[in-house]
Amino acid sequence: MKRTFQPSVLKRNRSHGFRARMATKNGRQVLARRRAKGRTRLTLSSK
């Protein structure tokens, strides 16, 4: 049986990246929460 997780950096960044988060109001809320919590990496794309 084929595995369900077929990694793609492009798809990953388009759905979970910084610019994807900034594009919507809720995404910006996610970033604000992570900033408030003190996360060193806000999104997976900011390494």
From Swiss-Prot:
One of its GO terms (molecular function) is structural constituent of ribosome. Gene3D superfamilies: 1.10.287.3980. One of its GO terms (biological process) is translation. It holds the Pfam family Ribosomal_L34. Keywords: Ribonucleoprotein, Ribosomal protein. InterPro entries: Ribosomal_bL34 (IPR000271), Ribosomal_bL34_CS (IPR020939). Transmembrane segments: none annotated. GO terms for cellular component: ribonucleoprotein complex; ribosome. This is Large ribosomal subunit protein bL34. It comes from Sodalis glossinidius (strain morsitans). The lineage of its organism: Bacteria, Pseudomonadati, Pseudomonadota, Gammaproteobacteria, Enterobacterales. The gene is rpmH.
